[in-house]
Amino acid sequence: MSERLSITPLGPYIGAQISGADLTRPLSDNQFEQLYHAVLRHQVVFLRDQAITPQQQRALAQRFGELHIHPVYPHAEGVDEIIVLDTHNDNPPDNDNWHTDVTFIETPPAGAILAAKELPSTGGDTLWTSGIAAYEALSVPFRQLLSGLRAEHDFRKSFPEYKYRKTEEEHQRWREAVAKNPPLLHPVVRTHPVSGKQALFVNEGFTTRIVDVSEKESEALLSFLFAHITKPEFQVRWRWQPNDIAIWDNRVTQHYANADYLPQRRIMHRATILGDKPFYRAG
């Protein structure tokens, strides 16, 4: 069997489909290296027909780095590093915005691996957008304005208290998460630690304000940036099939899960790979 992976770009800026890998078995070092560099280059990659268990998903994710355990979402049985995103009428989707995962911590995730376990008959697509392409499309004066600015990211923006009052145990878990994750600052423009490329690093899910400018200026800048980053030309859209896998670079992308499938059910498993502290370095 050939060790060579087939990598087909899905657009000029972001996204590729990969075939020739069996993720139910450990990848060879050669194949993992190809996969790793494909994620760096294309920012999100997709593989079909990968019926992996939570344990196998964890093992694959651990080859990319140390894993994050989410403070609120439920975990797969016996595998704390795999969160279960089970959405249906009694538990509707709660992240109906474009976001980068877990930017409310000092070292936001470097990436994530998402596995489709149960899908609606139609709908439930996920879209990703490229912060690199969005940054490179800006004029030079506007890039200069943004470079060096810092923005606040707040856990509570996507996890407000009212959503976690069903039980006292749930509310207590939320309070503990808030105490452990106070608002913090990240650069508005982030330098990728491996490629050196610059990317916009603000997202509607967690970014609350730009601290180096006035309140009105912050509102205007964030309103523009949220709209600009999510322009269709910077996006790729994936129509899920059972046992599909998506792997993305969380440092330079945002994503949006379409909530158009209720009352049907959608179950996804996610492993989240820890990253490093965001920084900006002039190119």
Swiss-Prot record:
Q: Does the keyword Oxidoreductase apply?
A: yes
A Pfam family that this protein carries is TauD
Residue sites binding 2-oxoglutarate per the record? T126, H255, R266, R270
* Key word Iron present: yes
Please give the catalytic activity noted in the UniProt record: taurine + 2-oxoglutarate + O2 = aminoacetaldehyde + sulfite + succinate + CO2 + H(+)
Q: What is its EC number?
A: 1.14.11.17
Q: Which GO terms describe its molecular function?
A: ferrous iron binding; identical protein binding; L-ascorbic acid binding; taurine dioxygenase activity
What is its cofactor?
A: Fe(2+)
- UniProt protein name: Alpha-ketoglutarate-dependent taurine dioxygenase
- Alphabetical list of NCBIfam families matching this protein: PRK09553.1
Q: Where are the transmembrane segments?
A: none
Q: What happens when the gene is disrupted?
A: Disruption of this gene leads to a loss of the ability to utilize taurine as a source of sulfur, but does not affect the utilization of a range of other aliphatic sulfonates as sulfur sources.
Q: How does activity depend on pH?
A: Optimum pH is 6.9.
Q: Which UniProt keywords apply?
A: Dioxygenase, Hydroxylation, Iron, Metal-binding, Oxidoreductase, Vitamin C
Task: Give the organism the record lists.
Answer: Escherichia coli (strain K12)
Encoding gene per record: tauD
What does this protein's record comment on cofactor binding?
Binds 1 Fe(2+) ion per subunit.
